[in-house]
Amino acid sequence: MKKRKIAAAVTSAVLLAVLSSVMSSVSRSLDDQNMAERWKGGELDYAQVSVFYPQSKSPYKETDAENLRNTITEKLKEGAFRPENEGAEIWKDAYSSVISVSSVFRYDESSGKTEPAGSDYSVAGVGGGFFEFHPLRLINGNYIYESELDNHRAVLDRQAAWDMFSSFEITGMKFILNGVEFEVAGVADPGDNRDIKKAYPPAPMIYIHYSALEEAGLDTSLLCYEAVIPDPVTNYARNIVLENFGINTMTENETDEDPEKKLDVVIVQNTDRYSVPKLWKGLSEFRTMAVSDRSIAYPYWENAARMTSVTMEILFLSALAAALLLFVLCVSEICRLYLNRKWHLKDFLEDMMYKYTYKKRTSDYITSPTDTGEKSRYDQ
C-alpha cells in the first residue's frame, strides 16, 4: 500500500509538471493574443484589448474606430504617458472588417485582358497596424501598411494566391475586385496552429486597405477594433475603452464582464484571458458559454482564441485534479506518520517541564561543579 501511494504521488507530481508546461506553451501559441508582450519594451506594462462589433441595421463604421482612437490618445495624454525612446509610439491599434465577394478577375498583362479567377473569396479590410497584431507568416513579398500612399495593394493568403495565379511568386501582379484594380504586395500563410486552421475561413482570403472597401463598393461595417495600451494598474487599459462607450465603473475588484453586459459590443482583454482567475471563471460558466445574446460574427482569430480557451480550461481542470490528488496523498502520508510516531506530545511536554522547572529549582542547592543536583531530588 505504501509503495502504491508513493507511485501515485510521483505520478501526480510528474503529471502536474507536464500539464503546467503544456498550459504555458498553449497560452503562448497564438500570436494574435500576445501583442502586449511583443510591444512591451521597458518596465511599463501593457494590455491588449479587443472590441467586437454587432452586425446590426445601424452598424459601426470606420468613424467609430477613429473616435475610439481619439479617446485613447486623449486619455494617455491626460496620464502623461511618454515613450521610453524618443520618436517611438506609446500605443498601437488596428481595426478590420470581413466581407464575402462572389468573384475576382485576374489581369493578364500579356494580353491586356481579364479573366475570372475563381469565386467565393473573403475580403478583409484592414487599418492601423493590423499585421503587427496578426503577424501572418509571409511566403512572398510584404505586408500592407496604413502609412503607405497607395491603398490599392493587397496581401493574399496562400489559397487565394494559388486560385488566382497558380503560384506564390506573384508580387506585383494585378487582379480586379468589384471593378477596382489591386496589386499583390505579398502572400501570407495563417500558420500551423491547430485552432487557427480550424477557425480560418474556408474561402480564400484577400487583405486590402480598409479605405479601399468603399471604393470597391463593399460593406464597410466595422467588425473588430484592437489596441495595445499602457496598463500600469489593473483594468486601466480596459477602462479607457469602456469610457468610450459611456461606462466608467471598472475597479480592480469588479467583475470584468459586468459593465460589458450593458453594451451591444463585446470587449475582451486578450492579455490575461488564459490567467488562472479567467480559467476558473470559464469553468464555472462552461455550461452557458455557447449561449450568446449578441449578433456578432467573430473573426477567425477570436474564434481560434475561444477554442484555445476551452483547451486551456480542460488542461487547467486536469491540473487541478492532479494537484488535489497529490495534496490528498501528502496529507494522508503525514497523518500516517503522525499516528505511527514513536514519540508523544505528553512525553515531550513532561521532559520540557522537568528540564526547565525541576532543574531550575534544584540548581539552588548545587554547591560545586561536580554536584548536578540529582542527589537533592531524593533528599527528604
Place the predicted regions along the sequence by residue:
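Mid-to-C-terminal secondary-structure elements
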Residues: 129-138, 156-244, 250-300
